[in-house]
Amino acid sequence: MDNGVETPQGQKTQPINLPPDRKRLRKHDGLGKGVKRKLFAEDSSPLKKQIPACSDMETLSSPVKFGCKSRSASALDESFGKCKHETACDCSAIEELLCHESLLDSPMKLSNAHTIFSSDKWKLELEKIIASKQIFLDMSENVELVAYGETLCNLRIFEKISSPFLFDVQSEERSYSVVYVPHNKELCGQFCQPEKTMARVLGVGAYGKVFDLDKVAIKTANEDESVISAFIAGVIRAKSGADLLSHDCVINNLLISNSVCMDHKVSLSRTYDVDLYKFEDWDVRNVMNYYSVFCKLADAVRFLNLKCRINHFDISPMNIFINHKKEIIFDAVLADYSLSEIHPEYNGTCAIAKEYDRNLQLVPISRNKFCDMFNPGFRPLVANAMILVNVCEAFDGENNPLRHCNLDLCAFAQVVLLCVLRMTDKRGCREAQLYYEKRLFALANEACRLNPLRYPFAYRDACCKVLAEHVVLLGLLFYRDVVDIYEKIYDFLDERGEFGLRDLFEATFLNNSKLTRRQPIRGGLASLQSSEYGEKLLHDLRALFLITSSADLDKDTSSLFQM
């Protein structure tokens, strides 16, 4: 999520076939020094969430109000969800996904990497503009990331801005997209030292921690993640047409931080009852409610890509947060931008301006590597297929935001698929997790533990098994389409001479198909097909899963997941 409050994905894992006591992960020999975002900390100890083994993911609560003095806990009345199960429950028997954030070396090293400025002259000029607050706002249609429609004459307006906001900064020859990141000393003193304020630890990761202080989520992060999160928060706020002084946390069903301290690399946001992965109260009779939620989340993906020109690249049920009452979902947001990237055509034009030290910070360069994108358990079919041919294959968006959007929507379809399986299983959500998700997550974790640069063949094998399992699960809902999808992937590998992977894909698919029964979901699936919104849900989901090649990413998906 925006850096506001998710527990860093993958810090909690529960190995397959284990009793309730969770076993610590052993350091896998596939990890190498080239890993950018690591599964293991520097001391080689496994990362873990420091929360009860069976608890729901505890995510942030109420928004922090910046413009007023009423920042007390009484104004923040959202509470964290608790696990419904006792200590002796079988939660730990369910395989949970490891962290799969970016696996490549960081492209943004200020000392020697590509700078966004064509020469020191332009960098010095832009720094001078920022330092003097001579920032001009433009509505030019030629600049996609331009945000606001007026020229600032009153420079003191910057003293009133409390949350990151995007501006178009003009030099004599170039236009830069710069997010102004204000520094609030009062909030810094209140939240930036959570250990000293006895804040409760929600999660621990390789690059920081997530705390809860009076129901406010505090996320500490590393430099790059703080920069990209602050930048994305400013872009979303501005491109939505939000007021310049807005400090909203939720915009267009996207959860963003409403305060980022670039001095301490701390961001604040709000909490929700639970994440979608931990939601267990699915009821096929409420499909209209669920379809409406999915439509809002799909619109969030479209807004992020088509308006903001940003790929999420980490869509999973763990990064979708909801408020609910029993089986009814009232509110849902997409969060966590740790893996997000600007569309590559904007490389070299994006930065943040930090009020606290009046310096510029470059936004990390987008490399668009498929192995950098998504958790393998929710990676689109087309992305996993491309990795099998070339581990370091880059996504060709062709400067077309629709292609970027469809790639994110295909990952969203993987999330919806698991939701439908939980919704339709007559045995209940817990059994659906154990029966349909356990093997998928075990295979995905196998890929997560490998560095694709050091062990490309092992990584491709692991991704091949994940791809086969995706097709197996897809066949449970769309058995008339699964043969065509299977044959397209098989032929794709065969035509490119990847005969070993082709045979591994075939063997894994055939073996896992024998182990997967459709019977538990037949009744629920029939109920889904008999309702108007259930039929629409299955139609839209099927259309996204029929995107199996790079050319398919040009399809018009604007009518899918629309109420």
UniProtKB/Swiss-Prot annotation:
Enzyme Commission number: 2.7.1.-
Bias kind Polar residues: ranges: 1-16
Broadest EC class assigned to this enzyme: transferase
Protein name: Probable ganciclovir kinase
Stated family: Belongs to the protein kinase superfamily. Tyr protein kinase family. HCMV ganciclovir subfamily.
UniProt-listed SUPFAM superfamilies: Protein kinase-like (PK-like)
Keyword check for ATP-binding: yes
Region (Disordered): 1-33
Record-linked PROSITE patterns: PROTEIN_KINASE_TYR (PS00109)
Single GO BP term: viral process
Membrane-spanning segments: none
Natural source organism: Human herpesvirus 6B (strain Z29) (HHV-6 variant B)
Binding site for ATP: L202, G203, V204, G205, A206, Y207, G208, K209, V210, K219
A Pfam family per the record: UL97
